[in-house]
């Protein structure tokens, strides 16, 4: 991940509805959530949610799958791990013991997404 890619990702999360959407999808895990359900839970019109889904998708934070007439969105956990790793690269001036809990969490996310 380079700086421009990180900025695109962070800008996508820098809006309240998109951040809430992303967090709900993280909580939902691999099952994901239907677009209509997310719009309803967040109290956002479906056409507005469509724009938010597009921004999150372009940032590679979520993916979608059409299931009949419904669209299910899922979080891209490997992208979450990638951006988190980018943000903490070189953490704590090389004193890795200070960052160990965070590094272990990232490793757990990466392991879960590669399985």
PLM feature spans:
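Amphipathic alpha-helical dimerization/coiled-coil segments
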Residues: 1-5, 26-27, 77, 81-115
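N-terminal helix-turn-helix DNA-binding core of bacterial DNA-binding proteins
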Residues: 4-45, 70-80
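Beta-hairpin "wing" of winged helix-turn-helix
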Residues: 58-67, 74
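Hydrophobic alpha-helical segments
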Residues: 32, 37, 59, 71, ...
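Short, hydrophobic-biased segments on the C-terminal half of alpha helices
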Residues: 53-54
């Amino acid at each position: 991940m380079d700086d421009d890619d990180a900025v695109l990702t962070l800008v996508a999360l820098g809006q309240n509805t998109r951040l809430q959407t992303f967090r709900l999808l993280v909580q939902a895990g691999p099952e994901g959530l239907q677009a209509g359900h997310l719009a309803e839970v967040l109290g956002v019109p479906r056409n507005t949610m469509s724009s938010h889904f597009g921004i999150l998708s372009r940032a590679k934070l979520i993916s979608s799958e059409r299931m009949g007439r419904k669209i299910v969105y899922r979080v891209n956990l490997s992208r979450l791990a990638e951006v988190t790793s980018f943000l903490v690269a070189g953490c704590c001036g090389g004193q890795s013991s200070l960052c160990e809990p965070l590094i272990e969490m990232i490793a757990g996310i990466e392991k879960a997404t590669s399985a």
